[in-house]
């Protein structure tokens, strides 16, 4: 029996009580004055007056509670033939050291850092190091074109950019440094520093007085014992800016706060994805997208899971068994990826022959999102993997599921082509053009009645007017999903 309906009703009856209870799973330096302040910001703000630190909750807290020797991060890179693991204690040390490096470069609370990196552990370390010192990271998908990167640098105005010499794709190396140099040339805003991770496959020339070598900085900090502690920030302070991937015009900088984000992600790991602390969770996405932010980095680490950072593809690295190898080797219990990945695997291995080569006995659930999950692909995955395949729907703007099938509360019947039910926090309606709710079977605009739940964007970076116009103006009192 699923407890979903009971939980959803409990949220409806007392939204503030529901989220205050969920917030007990997070460590706070100072508790909130109000769970929800309806007078703050564009539609109200969650956990107003509270103080916290996201990196502390992702790392130090687990070390202090005796989880230091558990694996926090598994880096698996078939494209470079490397694997590396970090315990919670090791990852905390690496993050504290790089946070010290950033501080020494003049990065402080509220400053922005653009991260333009491939799928390497240093990308995760840089994100968490920013969170540790209260800086705001803006991750740009590695290899994005120079003009796209330039618009983001111009909008975020970072003190520093953290990048790498290259990304690695099957059969080719993508030089990042020329793209970054061109972006800085195009941008009106010039970052003071660029920290460059030199990867063995391609060394990038460094620009004197601007570019610094990651390894040199980190080794120097370690030799001095330089580590930065966690800085207390307001729950309503930004953790990051993530630009929506619109390739035309000015991209929208989605703002994510610290407090509500942690509360919602921690709740989702147990209740939606059905995983427990200590288990291995794998989101086969990229840190440049929202799935990478929420479910490679923050969600699993907040929950005390082991997260997998995979630098490879569903097929061709080396074959259509790549995903099954990772699941088998690292004892993954739940995986989250895009339907496209499974369409590629199904095309290469329609009979699922590769699946038979691996022990997937510990694997429990597959989650799909990011685009439409066509019923054929879902059925194929169900049939071949013999586990529930859960389609769910959300947005960069929300940071976690709007609709899904909450495994941790007990599975609801799966209906192919449907993301099942709204999560607690989302009062979802289909509206006609006059803002009237439509009955089942009618087509209209999907809208969420305000206020949005914790983790959802409070506004756009430096652009409240555009936020109101894009999301709140079409149907007064509602957030328009545009889906």
Predicted regions and their residues:
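N-lobe entry segment of adenylate-forming
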Residues: 1-86, 90-93, 97-100, 184, ...
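Conserved beta-loop-beta connector loops within the AMP-binding
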Residues: 429-450
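ANL superfamily adenylate-forming
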Residues: 80, 163-235, 348-351
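Conserved AMP-binding/adenylate-forming core of the ANL superfamily
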Residues: 55-56, 73-128, 145, 149-150, ...
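Conserved pre-ATP/AMP-binding loop-to-beta segment of ANL
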Residues: 69-71, 194-197, 207-243, 250, ...
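Conserved ATP-binding/catalytic segment of the ANL
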Residues: 244, 447-483
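Gly/Ser/Thr-rich phosphate-binding loop
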Residues: 305, 333-337, 346-413, 427, ...
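Conserved AMP-binding/adenylation subdomain of ANL enzymes
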Residues: 262-280, 290-334, 347-353
């Amino acid at each position: 029996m699923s407890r979903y309906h009971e939980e959803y009703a409990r949220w409806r009856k007392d939204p503030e009580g529901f989220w205050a209870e969920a917030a007990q799973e997070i460590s706070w330096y100072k508790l909130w004055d109000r769970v929800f302040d309806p007078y703050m910001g564009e539609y109200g703000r969650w956990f107003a007056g509270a103080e916290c630190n996201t990196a502390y909750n992702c790392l130090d807290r687990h070390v202090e509670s005796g989880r230091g020797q558990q694996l926090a991060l598994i880096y698996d890179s078939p494209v470079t033939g490397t694997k590396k693991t970090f315990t919670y204690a090791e990852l905390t040390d690496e993050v504290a050291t790089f946070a010290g490096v950033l501080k020494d470069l003049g990065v402080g609370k509220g400053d922005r850092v653009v991260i333009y990196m491939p799928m390497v552990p240093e990308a995760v370390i840089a994100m968490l190091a920013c969170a540790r010192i209260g800086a705001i990271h803006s991750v740009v998908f590695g290899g994005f074109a120079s003009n796209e990167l330039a618009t983001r640098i111009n909008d975020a105005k970072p003190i520093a950019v953290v990048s790498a010499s290259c990304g690695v794709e099957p059969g080719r190396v993508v030089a990042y440094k020329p793209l970054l140099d061109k972006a800085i040339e195009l941008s009106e805003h010039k970052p003071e520093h660029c920290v460059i991770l030199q990867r063995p496959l391609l060394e990038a020339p460094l620009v004197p007085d601007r570019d610094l070598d990651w390894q040199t900085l980190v080794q120097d900090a370690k030799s001095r014992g330089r580590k930065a502690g966690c800085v207390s920030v307001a729950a309503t302070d930004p953790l990051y800016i993530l630009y929506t991937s619109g390739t035309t015009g000015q991209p929208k900088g989605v703002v994510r706060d610290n407090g509500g984000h942690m509360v919602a992600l921690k709740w989702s790991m147990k209740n939606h994805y059905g995983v427990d602390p200590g288990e291995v969770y794998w989101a086969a996405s990229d840190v440049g997208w929202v799935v990478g932010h929420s479910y490679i980095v923050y969600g699993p680490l907040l929950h005390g899971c082991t997260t997998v950072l995979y630098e490879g593809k569903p097929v061709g690295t080396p074959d259509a068994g790549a995903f099954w190898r990772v699941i088998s080797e690292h004892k993954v219990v739940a995986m989250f990826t895009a339907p496209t990945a499974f369409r590629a695997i199904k095309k290469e291995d329609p009979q699922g022959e590769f699946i038979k080569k691996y022990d997937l006995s510990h694997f429990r659930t597959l989650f799909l999102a990011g685009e439409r999950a066509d019923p054929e692909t879902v059925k194929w995955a169900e049939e071949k993997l013999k586990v529930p395949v859960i389609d769910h729907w959300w947005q960069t703007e929300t940071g976690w599921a709007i609709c899904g099938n909450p495994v941790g509360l007990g599975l609801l019947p799966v209906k192919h082509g449907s993301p099942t039910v709204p999560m607690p926090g989302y009062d979802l309606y289909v509206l006609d053009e006059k803002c009237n709710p439509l009955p089942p079977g009618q087509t209209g605009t999907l809208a969420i009645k305000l206020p949005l739940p914790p983790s959802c964007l409070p506004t756009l970076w430096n652009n409240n007017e555009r936020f109101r116009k894009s999301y709140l103006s079409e149907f007064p009192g509602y957030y328009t999903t545009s889906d």
